[in-house]
Each structure stands twice: as structure tokens, then as C-alpha cells.
């Protein structure tokens, strides 16, 4: 419990307390709860140390802000660094707005509360996975520029402020309009209309000259970049509400100062503590364990930690489509798709095995579909998805890795070299680029690399046309082209099981003989037994045999489910855990 | 670092010092290498126009520093020292090398020096200078050699005589619509058109700096106007009207297949904004595409294949080169006659382009279909129209050659080639003295010669222009905000 004593003026201790609270709350929340945001954002961009990369950000106002944000985002590779970066920026926002408050309304009892609102709303915004650090940097820089504006109001300072507005616009883009709004509100209260009018004239000239002479950008780009897209938020108006809050911030602080003339420390401290309590409550309420699990799975998936993905999903049984897709892909990578896929939820049928191409879905989400093609050995199609992603989103670690790998597998070394050159110019992926670079000069390393050589074996032996909207068709084409592709066969059988087509599973059993597989995968055995039980005798399986263990389990399953209702089966009551992880249970419950 | 040609005597002295080890400590042995150095781009033995931009290159040999002594047959000499192997010619010195040197040569003597000061002298690399200048400007579409998605597409113009480059159209200003291919009326920068696909779609006609947006698809047309060809008089544009599908290959040798399901030819009257069909008398249904006029405008060349259906194997679609006589006064066409029977050799023709003198026609020959840019085997062929004889051109490589165009004087061919990496097209220029005198092509020089090595974007449909396009991205943006003028339909 914080002890509060009545003091005539706001004290340093309270301000420090506020700053410590902002730092602690944001740091701890990001470190312990939503660190997946770091993983997500770090994996959606690639900061490249090259003039070409930097040059792109110079071509539009606000680009430098995004560039600075991207530079900082590199630190997100580590959760501690990431949390510290976010916490420092938010704390700096609070510090700057405290200074503004002190300038505008010294001894204001609501000063701490308003400054904490400023940083807490940005903290809340930052918990959206698409809200990036440059957005908070924008608010921070705007706050600093506003502070400079109000700190010295002599003629020369005013001229400097006016003449630097175009530069401020170039650096921050949209935030210049936020500054314009703040400065206007402030000057209305100060009754300094000449400066306001001059500022608006400079702003109007700035945007007109920018549009007509300098930047090849549409009006929308000049007005709203680099704000996050409104569509990223469940309430698209959130961004505009926040902007309005900051625009009217000077009014809030000036008017609140007029409410109560003398400083009341209790009011001051309790009000800002209330903001923190409310923020903490919202943060905890908004926290989604499911989302956190999906990104943890994705992190393991990107690290190719297949066993980690499998065990995690089997433990937490996440119902999210992406989680199930990663689980199935990880199983396929480990050659266990038809042995283990029913050990975790399968709620989406074949959708959780493959994601069909759709130009209506944002590449950001669609991109995950690439792994099906890469896993199955349709390297050209995997390359296409990675390339489409690069075209629409720019380079990010996953698409560039896949571009390099697919080109190496296909023997397109000169193209691979281009991407490797890019990867070499990054901070965290230099070493990986070095590994790929060594493959360029020594293709034997490609043949000896377990991941790449395996893909090369799975590739089609002859050409066919990819069916982009119906990925299942491609499995058949691939199997025709390369009958030895066990992974394609497993995918085919998995799809048939998910579609509950046991008869077709049985009809395809003989294809197992075309592969190196000398045993029937567990779930396929289960499908075969079910078929035998429901429809009749199995075809000749030559050397393949159904194991006694599966036969025994089937017998147990029949016995257990014979005397219980369908609802009880669905609820899983009275069913042994091992029997819930079977194709029979999937058939009964889906 | 450049030591320029202020005084030839001093330059020779410096070069002599370099050779004798005067510049470096160490034993200073000079060994003569009995081959040319590897340079990027490969400019060895190319024929260049007397008004081309500096042919900067980088040396792909081991060495801590390099020295290039450049000698021209007009007696000019420059010396360039480089620490990173990149040889950049100063513009003024380069111009002096070219001035009055038509028909002559430029030889570059290269020396590499290693860490210990040992020097290697290579056989000189030579450029041949043609008598004929090249058109001063080039335009191209710059985009990712992608599949379905696009974000950044620009049409840029570049001065062939320097490195000056600027945007003509930028899809950032066109609501990120797709910018399709552009087409000029006889290399005229004041008269060209471009299709835009998307929310501000239409065909944009640029005349001087005035840009108008038109909707050429009339209700009578099943499909939109696609591949254009300006009639030399500038009054008409022939278009193919195509239904195009795109598919992707599973095999590593191929990427994309772009196929027509149906296509026919139409002619657009630019002044009257009226579209008219090119009559088809044949009972057999054909797909007709890639129109091209002869320089006098009395022949319409195009590619023609038997019409297929959805179930047809794309590999079976083969296009012949065909032409029809055109009578402008009566707006009537003659009967189709086959100019090059590609089907008989199990090949397919695309992109016919007639030389300005009307004697030659260059086309792309490939295995099937009409969209050769994704066909590794696509090569340029030169057809002597009067002799009816076509031959594979010496300018080809193992990768795709396509999208060729002639300079206005007919002495230079500009084409895209994917020879550097198999994926990204680069603009190559080749001297065309006559049918049997074609120079080794060179890639359009860049200020940074390593640009092509790291650039992932592709140079699409490079075209020569006799000057700079006066219209700019903002003109197109303004035009996009106006309603498209709808074309009418008339059957002659």
C-alpha cells in the first residue's frame, strides 16, 4: 500500500512512481503475457542493412519513422530486449506528457492521471499484434515536438518551429497532423491565432508541395501513413479516437487545471493509480491464452521443432485452425501424420491439413499455407507462395528462407544467391545466410542436408499443372508423378480419413506398397478395421498386415461404445483416453 | 577512385608506375594472363552505339585493387583505379571516348593487384562502336517477376545516353491497380497507350502530356482489349481481345503458363473512339493475338492458333505467324496468309515486330502457347519477309529471350533476356547492321554495374523511344479520377 501524504505541489516521487509503474506494467505484461507479439512482428519484417532498403523509406513522409521502428523491432528476437524497448518507449511517452502537463498546467491534480492515460492507451494499442513500435514512436516524437513548441514561445522559436514543420512531416508523416491539431488546440487556449494560422498555412503548403512536386504518393498516403490500418482493430474507430484524445490533450490538461486550483495529492495519485488498475484489468481481460498458444506453436514450428509442436498441441489441444494445421504439418514432417493425427483435435476436416489459395485472404494469414506444399515436396508451388508473400509483404524471415531453400532445391543457384545476399545484410540471419552461401559453391552440401535433400526426393518427377484452389487435387497429381512420395500418400490418406471416406482409404492401401513403407500406419489400420466391420472384407494387402494391438483396441472400442449413447461418446465419458485418440472416435464424434 | 584523363602523358606515367610496382610495396611481379578478365556484365566484344551511357562494369577477378587503362581508337585514354573492382567511367571522359569514334573500338587493359603486390595483366576487353546511334530514351515496366500478386508496378523511362531515370506511371498513385503493357506509336514518346486493370481501370492514351482514360470494352466484345499495336499513321490501334488464364507448373524447369482460351482482333479508331472487329472469313475458329503493323500500315501481322477449350492440353496450342492486307481507305482486310508456319515444326510464334524498313520481322519462337516470357526455350528469330526465310538469331542465350523492339532507325534491337539468372528479365541491346551482321548484345549499362546481380525486379517490355515521355505519374493520376470515355462499336 502506497502511503500518501498531502503536499502542496506535485512531487517528483509521484512522477517517478508513475514512470516506474508504466515501465513495470508494460515490461512485465509484454515479457510474461504477450511476448508472442515480439515473435509475430519480428517474423513479419526483415530489417536489411542496405541503401536500397533504407531508400524505400525516404520516398514517403513518415517512412523514416517506420524505418526507425523496424530497426528497433530487430530487438524483438529476444523477449527481454523486446519488453525493454516497448517499456522504454511507453515510459518516455509518459515522461514527455508529464513535462507537457507541467508546462501547461503546473500543480494540476489531474496531471499524473492524464499522462498515465496517454501511455496506458498506447500500451493497450500495442497489445494488438499489428500495432507496431513506430506508431508509439510517432506519439513520442509528436509529444517532444509539442513540448519544444510550448517551451519557448519567442519569435525566433516560432520561426524555427514553422520552418521545421516540413521536416517534421517528412520524418513522421501523419503525426505531423496530430502535432498540428495539438498545437492548434493549445494556441486557441493561448489565443495565439497568428501562429496557428501561420502553422496551418505552412502545413497546407507542405502537403500541397509534397503531393504535387516531391512525393509520388496518393493523398491517403500523405494523410494517414504510417498509422496502423483501422481494419487491424476490432473497433476500427479506435485509431481515430486515440488520435482525437491526443489532439485534445492540451485542452484536457488546461481545462482540468481550471477545475481545481490547488494541488491535491490524494486526488492526483489515486486517479492515476485508478488508471493503472483499470489498464491492468483490461490487459488481463484481453489476454487470450489461445492466441498465446498458437504463437508459441508457430514459434516452435518456424524453428522446425516438430516434436515440440506435436507434444505442445497434444498437451494443450488448441481448437484454433492454425494450431491444428501446424500440428498436422509437424506430424507429416516427422512421418507420423497417419499414426498420430487423432491424438489432438481435428475440428476443421481437410482445412487443417492444407490451406487453399485465395486472393481474398490477406497474404499475412494465407502465407502459412506454404508449408503444406513445402512438406509434401511441391517445391515450385512452395516457391510461388513464398514469392507472392515477398511481393505483397516484402521480405520477412520465413519467406526469404523458403525462397532460398526452394531455389537451392530446384538448382536455381543464381536466384538463390540474390536472396542470400539480402539475408546476409541482416543482423540475426547472417549466420544462416552463410550456411546457404556455402551451399552455392558446394551443391554437395544441398544433397547432404537432411531437409533439402528430402524435399528433392519428394519432388514431382515430371511436370503437371498445379490446381491452386483445390490443393487436394495436387496430391493425386504428385502421387502419379512420384509414386514413391510417402508423404503425399500420407496426406492423401489423412484427407480421406478427415472426410470419413473409409472405403477410399482401403482402396488406396495398396499404394503403400509403392513406397518404402513396410507397415500400415496406425490410423490407416483403424480405418481398415472400421471398413471391415461396417462394409466387408478388405482387399489383398500382400505383405502388409494389421497389427494385433490395433485389432485388440478395436475390439475394446466396440465393446465400450456398444452400450453407451452417442451423446456420452461425444462427451467422452466412459471412453479410455487411448481410445479417444483413434479414427473410430473421430468418426463417432464428428 | 578515378584518375581522369587530364594529361595523357601523366596517365601513362601513372600506369607505368603501376606496372612497375611503384604504387605498392612488395616484389611487384607482373604476370600476363592469357585470357580476358571476367567482368560483369559481360561486355567483352559487344557492339555499342556512339551515344550510349558509360558501360560501367565490375571485375570478377581476385585482387585487392584494380587498374583499368581505357584506350579508344580516336586516341583518347583514361585511367581508372578501383579498390572494389567496380569500374565507373566518368561521364565526360566516356563521351570523349565515343566522340568521333564511330566505327572504331575501345580497348580496356585491366590489371589486378593482390595483397602482396603481385600484379596480373589480362588480355584487353574490347567494345566495338557502331556508326549508328541508338534512340535516346528507353521505357520499361519494372515489377516483380511474380505470379498472381502485385503491389508495386511502375513504368519508367531511362535515358540511354546517361543514367537518368524517372517514373512515367506509378501504381501507388493509381490505387495500386495493375499496370499492363505499354505501347508506342513508332517509338514516339508523345503517343502511347497503357492498360490499367482494377478500380481505375481503362486504357490510358497519352498524347504529349495530355492523358485520357478510355474504356475500350464495348458490349459487343466478349473480352477486353489486350495486346496493342499502333498503326503507323497513329489513327488506329489494333488490339487482340483475349480471355487469358494463368496456371503454375509443378516442375522446376517451368514456372508459369499463360494461356488464351479465346482471342480475336479488333481495331480501334483513336480519334473517333470507335472499336471495330477485324473480320474473320474462316470457317475454322482461330485464336488471334499479338497484332503488329508493317511500317506502311498496309499489312497486319499477328499470331494465330486453332481455338481450344478448357480441357485442351496447353502444350498442344501452337501459333503460326499470319498476316492480312489492310486497306485504310475502305477499312477492309484481305485474306489471312501464313507468313511463318510454326505448327509444321511443332513450335509456336509470339511477339512479331517488323523492322522500320519493313524488310525484317523478329519474332519469338517457343514450344507452345503465346506467352513466351515464361518459356526458357524462347528465342528470337529473324524473318526476312520478302525471302520468307527465318533464322535463329545469334543474340539468344539458353534462357528466355522475348519482348523485343526496334530502334527508330532500325539499327538496334532492344529485347528482354533472362540469361543472368533465368528469372528476372534484363534489357539487352544488340546492333543490327543487316540480317547477317548482328552484334553481340549488351545489357543496358547501369551506374552501379552490380545492380542486376541483386535486383529481384524484372525489366518488362523494354521499348526504344525517340525522346522523353512528357507525361508523368501525376498526369495519369489526374486522368484516373475522370470517368473513362466509353468506346463505341462499328462494323465496317
Question: Which residue ranges define each predicted feature?
Answer:
Chain A
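N-terminal membrane topogenic signal
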Residues: 6-23, 105-111
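Transmembrane signal-anchor helices characteristic of membrane glycosylation enzymes that use polyprenol
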Residues: 15-39, 205-211, 277-283
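Membrane-interface coil-to-helix junctions
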Residues: 28-89
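Membrane-interface micro-motifs in multi-pass membrane enzymes
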Residues: 43, 58-62, 82, 86, ...
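Transmembrane helices and adjacent periplasmic/lumenal helix-loop junctions
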Residues: 130-134, 151-194, 204-214
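Internal/C-terminal transmembrane anchor helices
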Residues: 263-288
